[in-house]
Design a protein with these regions (language model features):
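C-terminal accessory/interaction regions of large nucleic acid-associated machines
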Residues: 247-255, 261-265
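Short, compositionally biased low-complexity segments
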Residues: 1-6, 235-239, 259
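Catalytic centers of nucleases
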Residues: 26-30, 34-89
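Charge-dense, extended regions
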Residues: 260-317
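Acidic metal-coordinating catalytic centers involved in nucleic-acid phosphodiester chemistry
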Residues: 89-251
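Broad structural signal for hydrophobic residues in well-ordered alpha-helices, predominantly aliphatic
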Residues: 33, 124, 263-266
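Acidic-basic catalytic patches of nuclease active cores, encompassing PD-(D/E)XK
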Residues: 2-44
């Protein structure tokens, strides 16, 4: 499931998509509707009738959608009114089976289109010759009534951005990340086999307190990670990923001397740059990074005679 932080991220991207004008907004809206309805049909424009004022039919033809991405910069209210009336008239003439008409738009609704909607509702009220429910879906409606109803996979098809391994050579660890996200915190493996905190190595690499806290939280899942690697068909997978982590760390060190930036680059390679918008995803990324930190695969090992981290191998300046 997408947690509240990721839902906020998707909502922000939705609002950005809805700023687009013309076809860009209409394509976005129909992409959502096509996933909202399993029987959604969007006829291609043909001949003099075009698409018949139809941007989608759903629920066995009982719902007809018309989408309008605002194009006008002057006379906006009049043009929205004209578009609404034109699409409704064309839909009424071409499609005789619908009982609900939805006008999906990112245009502001001023007095003129509002009056048109009221007039059409009176003309097609219950008890008239052709009763039709007339609905206006604006940006908020499109979110709550369509986007918010989709599964995470469907939503990611329309608005790509669900966290993933940014580095292609770590992509097969996505399954591990997802398995760690499912940990509820109550299972026995959540408290067993916790690795001792290697404070000397953390001191030697001058890890900031925030990173230490992240690593310490991640270590609670180390037994899960051991178990996951032991269950993989390729016994060399763990060593292969350890080598890749080492390369990513070394590349980060070549780009910056700030240990916080280095850690962030390692996190991003594993979970994507926006990994921390999801609390569970962030904890899983911390866990895997701490796992390879503790097993000496990333960052530098202090000399054998280093007692307390007086030497600072990586600076934060």
């Amino acid at each position: 499931m997408i947690d509240s932080a990721w839902k906020s991220w998707y909502r922000a991207r939705h609002d950005q998509r809805c700023i687009a004008s013309g076809d860009a907004f209409e394509d976005y809206a129909t992409a959502l509707l096509a996933r909202l309805h399993s029987d959604y049909l969007n006829p291609a424009p043909m001949g003099k009738h075009g698409d018949g004022g139809c941007d989608g039919l759903a629920d066995n033809g009982s719902i007809l959608y018309a989408c309008y991405g605002q194009r006008a910069t002057t006379g906006v209210d009049q043009k929205t009114k004209d578009k609404l009336e034109s699409d409704f008239a064309r839909g009424l003439a071409c499609w005789n089976g619908f009982s609900t008409w939805r006008f999906v738009t990112n245009a502001l609704f001023g007095p003129l289109p509002t009056k048109s909607v009221l007039a059409l509702r009176q003309q097609h009220a219950s008890g008239t010759q052709r009763p039709i429910t007339i609905e206006i879906w604006q940006v908020d409606d499109l979110w709550w009534k369509a986007a918010d109803k989709l599964t995470p996979a469907q939503l990611d098809e329309v608005i790509p951005g669900v966290p993933h391994a940014e580095n292609v050579e770590l992509a097969d660890l996505v399954e591990l990340i997802l398995s760690l996200e499912d940990v509820d915190g109550d299972g026995p493996d959540h408290i067993e086999s916790i690795r001792p905190v290697p404070s000397t190595k953390m001191d030697f690499n001058n890890l900031p307190e925030t990173t230490r806290a992240e690593f310490n939280a991640g270590r609670l899942l180390s037994a899960r990670i051991d178990k996951w690697f032991s269950e993989q068909a390729d016994p060399a997978l763990r060593d292969e990923k350890a080598q890749r982590f080492r390369v990513i760390y070394q590349e980060a060190r070549q780009a910056t001397r700030d240990v916080r930036e280095i850690v962030r680059r390692v996190y991003g390679a594993l979970g994507g740059q926006d990994f921390d918008l999801s609390t569970k995803r962030a904890n899983a990324v911390y866990a895997v990074t701490a796992y390879f930190f503790d097993s000496c695969d990333i960052f530098e090992e202090p000399p054998a005679d280093n007692a307390g981290g007086e030497v600072r191998h990586v600076t934060t300046y």
